[in-house]
């Protein structure tokens, strides 16, 4: 069901004309297996690539979940996409009020234009952990994406250091998305790449996080993505909910 406080329109017709590079898509390579208690579907749009020289296969997995913006009592969503090409893994994480499971653009009209959110916690918040097969991540780049997932040109992207935190990693929460952007169906996206060693544990965990820039509780309230094998279809767990996954292999 749609949030009564949000207006909707077709995502195909609502694509922004103000964006930079666009990620290539190949929907024909996607398959979706939903086990979500809230009937969230996930999808994988990143085209897979076979690296002939290394005889490696690129694997794309997408994990989604939903929370509640407790300041306005409306749904908010996260989407985490991983692309593993055998030598590195790229993580792309988006927080948005536009439900990724639908073909319409949900516009949270209740939001104040000046209201703003982060997609990460403080420096004390562990965002993700990595198994022994991974190298050390160095930087994360944050930017605003439109409802198709394309990066918009304004505001400009910002790159910050990834820091060790506890048993995992985090990045600074200075980049934000405001209500005016959210009401266009936009999302707050951060991406980072981690090298993969030849052997070892390739599991990882991810802790989705979002809150108002003025502080408060995590809108995703303890949800966690746990993946043991990122080269095959995996299931994320979020409390009693189970987010669906999609895998594209070539």
What residues fall within each predicted segment?
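Intrinsically disordered, low-complexity segments of exported/surface proteins
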Residues: 1-250
């Amino acid at each position: 069901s749609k949030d009564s406080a949000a207006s909707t329109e077709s995502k195909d017709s609502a694509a922004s004309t103000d964006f930079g590079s666009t990620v290539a898509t190949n929907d024909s390579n996607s398959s979706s297996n939903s086990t979500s208690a809230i009937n969230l579907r996930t999808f994988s749009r990143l085209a897979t690539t076979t690296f002939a020289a290394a005889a490696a296969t690129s694997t794309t997995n997408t994990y989604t979940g939903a929370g509640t913006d407790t300041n306005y009592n409306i749904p908010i969503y996260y989407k985490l996409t991983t692309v593993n090409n055998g030598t590195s893994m790229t993580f792309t994480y988006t927080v948005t009020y536009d439900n990724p499971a639908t073909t319409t653009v949900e516009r949270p009209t209740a939001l104040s234009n000046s209201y703003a959110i982060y997609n990460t916690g403080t420096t004390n918040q562990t965002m993700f952990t990595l198994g022994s097969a991974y190298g050390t991540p160095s930087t994360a780049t944050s930017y605003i994406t439109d409802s198709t997932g394309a990066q918009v040109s304004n505001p400009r992207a910002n790159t910050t250091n990834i820091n060790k935190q506890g048993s995992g990693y985090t990045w600074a929460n200075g980049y934000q998305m405001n209500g005016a952007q959210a009401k266009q169906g936009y999302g707050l996206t951060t991406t980072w790449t981690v090298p993969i060693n030849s052997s070892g544990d390739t599991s990882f965990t991810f802790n989705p996080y979002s809150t108002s820039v003025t502080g408060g509780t995590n809108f995703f309230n303890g949800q966690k993505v746990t993946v043991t094998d990122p080269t095959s279809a995996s299931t994320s767990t979020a409390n009693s909910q189970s987010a669906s996954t999609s895998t594209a292999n070539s």
